[in-house]
């Protein structure tokens, strides 16, 4: 097997959707028995309760979670495919396994547009 350079790996990761990259990270963690949790997360939990409102306003990344597909499952699958780079089978599997994140780390605008599109197709969606 040819050895890939760091640059080649990064280029390959750039082509993955957030869901595919998340699945890769989970598989990597399981295979090598490591965790990708950033040590900064511990420091982020330290602010006092009075700062909770400020932290809420500063949130810049949002997850769009598909809670259920509703009655129009085919339309929801089409919207999932449009929002992600998933193929038909992967999009169907994602919709079938709801509740599941459709987009992770999206901007507020992208998350709102995705929620609107999915709800327009008949899905129940939450933005976290």
From Swiss-Prot:
Record keywords: Ribonucleoprotein, Ribosomal protein
Family per record: Belongs to the bacterial ribosomal protein bL12 family.
Name of protein: Large ribosomal subunit protein bL12
Source organism: Kocuria rhizophila (strain ATCC 9341 / DSM 348 / NBRC 103217 / DC2201)
Gene3D superfamilies reported in the protein's UniProt record: 3.30.1390.10, Single helix bin
SUPFAM superfamilies on file: ClpS-like, Ribosomal protein L7/12, oligomerisation (N-terminal) domain
GO biological process: translation
Molecular functions per Gene Ontology: mRNA binding; structural constituent of ribosome
């Amino acid at each position: 097997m040819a050895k890939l350079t760091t640059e080649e790996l990064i280029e390959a990761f750039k082509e993955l959707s957030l869901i595919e990259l998340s699945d890769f990270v989970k598989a990597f963690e399981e295979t090598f028995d490591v965790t990708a949790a950033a040590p900064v997360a511990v420091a982020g939990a330290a602010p006092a309760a009075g700062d909770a409102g400020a932290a809420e306003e500063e949130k810049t990344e949002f997850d769009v979670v598909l809670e259920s597909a509703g009655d129009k499952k085919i339309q929801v699958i089409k919207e999932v495919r449009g929002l992600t780079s998933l193929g038909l089978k992967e999009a169907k599997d994602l919709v079938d396994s709801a509740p599941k994140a459709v987009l992770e780390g999206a901007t507020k605008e992208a998350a709102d547009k995705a929620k609107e599109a999915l709800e327009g197709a008949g899905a129940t969606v939450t933005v976290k």
